[in-house]
Amino acid sequence: EVGLRLFGALCKHIKRQRISVEGSVRLISDINLYSDFVGSLRQKPLGPYFRALRELGQIYLVRIDAPAASYFGGGVKKGSRMAAKGASSTTMAMQAKELAVIIADTRRYGGVFTVEEVLGFAERRADWFAVRGEVERGMYGVGCLVM
């Protein structure tokens, strides 16, 4: 019971925080320490919960480089802004697709978290508002054509 309460408290705490890529390293480190503590309790049923929590930390670790030209146009000519936006948005789309794959992989979380729950955690990324559209496009396949 103590382990499940700790798991619930950690999940609740993570959902309250905005977590950056740099903060994800600390989060993963802390989760590993909690996981080691729970392992020392020798309660095997708790293992999958904390393994899923360790995997969950990976969604904050994926760096997505938002295109600067779309936010700040200072000093960039119109023609070059479009070229820069196209090149960086391709990179951003690939990075967002990588994050979408991590979010949608249900086997990764061992049935502890559903895709919707993982998406709820992903919404706590510090850059979520900038990358939300690309991640959802990668997850749900918006813009796909069926031939």
Where are these regions (language model features)?
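Extended alpha-helical "rod" scaffolds
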Residues: 1-147
